Amino acid sequence: MEERRVSISSITWRFPMLFAPVDDVTTIDDLTLDPYPIYRRMRVQNPVVHVASVRRTFLTKAFDTKMVKDDPSRFSSDDPSTPMKPAFQAHTLMRKDGTEHARERMAMARAFAPKAIADHWAPIYRDIVNEYLDRLPRGDTVDLFAEICGPVAARILAHILGICEASDVEIIRWSQRLIDGAGNFGWRSELFERSDEANAEMNCLFNDLVKKHRSAPNPSAFATMLNAPDPIPLSQIYANIKIAIGGGVNEPRDALGTILYGLLTNPEQLEEVKRQQCWGQAFEEGLRWVAPIQASSRLVREDTEIRGFIVPKGDIVMTIQASANRDEDVFEDGESFNVFRPKSAHQSFGSGPHHCPGAQISRQTVGAIMLPILFDRFPDMILPHPELVQWRGFGFRGPINLPVTLR
């Protein structure tokens, strides 16, 4: 067996070179339809495994996924073969490290700060939620995914980004095309063609909005970045807005749909959540149970040992937070939705320098505003046919319909 010397954390070791096993059976379609049985098997049999169809080495245990995301010196966000670059037509802050990443992230941080959310955005969010709920017909069966989850997320995002001129339909379409492109690990040309169309439409709108936001500064992310004392380049401002559109619709939309499904299929838990008014707890459990962003990739900067296997420099590892959130070492019966499980931190918002900047917005809009208002309006809402709810997604996942009866 071949041997080589590998330097890890300034210690030089000598050992046989064992590469991770290869899974050449699992397909992207398998992962899109239902990845959870696959991840459960991987955690037990091969927690470090190279999945040939995705061309990446999967890490499925919580310790490993957090370790990778917390250590950008060894695991870079700059995945050279990521479909995110063609999907967004940019090298976005999601694929940058160090000072470059920090500068672009901080450029819009003020718009997402907890004080700005509480003082400025929360009252707007409440008005939006009430306006959209006013449209719902009591007593009817309604697809909340189509009528509420997506549109409310889009309208809230339009305000905080400063793109209110875009319709809900446009923002939802752009977001879906961006994330379909970013998760296009099969490199299907038609998905990039659709994201190209979305980029062209967004660029046209953004060009029209630059003058408005420069002449009338406001708390939106667009205006905040444009009017900063040392602004980042306009191309990166556009890229930041696109990243926010990509994640800012699907994350709260899919989180809300997942939480509603979990509560409505566990009525005893729902009643206890209502009694305790612990909507924030329900929010966190929903994100743990089905992470809206299921996986993240990192470029390995130096030969590294993980669980006895060499992950070589230049390899791309994929941290599967969807699997980490159900890891038996962290969560008892992690496959089940249980609002009242013992507290353990999930990884749905990431970890380390790339921790999701919109985490507090999502907690506020979904956990603190939408859930209590929705169940106050429709306290006896039911999901009459849970088996009709469909779930999709490998990189990004959630229900794609949610037919409930409003009572």
UniProtKB/Swiss-Prot annotation:
Classification via InterPro entries: Cyt_P450, Cyt_P450_B, Cyt_P450_CS, Cyt_P450_sf
Q: What induces it?
A: Transcriptionally activated in the presence of wounded plant tissue and by plant phenolic compounds, such as acetosyringone.
The record's listing under Pfam families reads:
p450
Q: Origin, by domain of life?
A: Bacteria
Q: Which cofactor does it need?
A: heme
List ligand-binding residues for heme. C356
Q: What is its EC number?
A: 1.14.-.-
Q: Which GO terms describe its molecular function?
A: heme binding; iron ion binding; monooxygenase activity; oxidoreductase activity, acting on paired donors, with incorporation or reduction of molecular oxygen
Its biological purpose: Not essential for virulence, but may be involved in the detoxification of plant protective agents at the site of wounding.
Task: Provide the family line.
Answer: Belongs to the cytochrome P450 family.
Q: What is this protein called?
A: Cytochrome P450-pinF2, plant-inducible
The scientific name of the source species is Rhizobium radiobacter
Q: What is the lineage of its organism?
A: Bacteria, Pseudomonadati, Pseudomonadota, Alphaproteobacteria, Hyphomicrobiales
- What gene is this protein a product of? cyp104
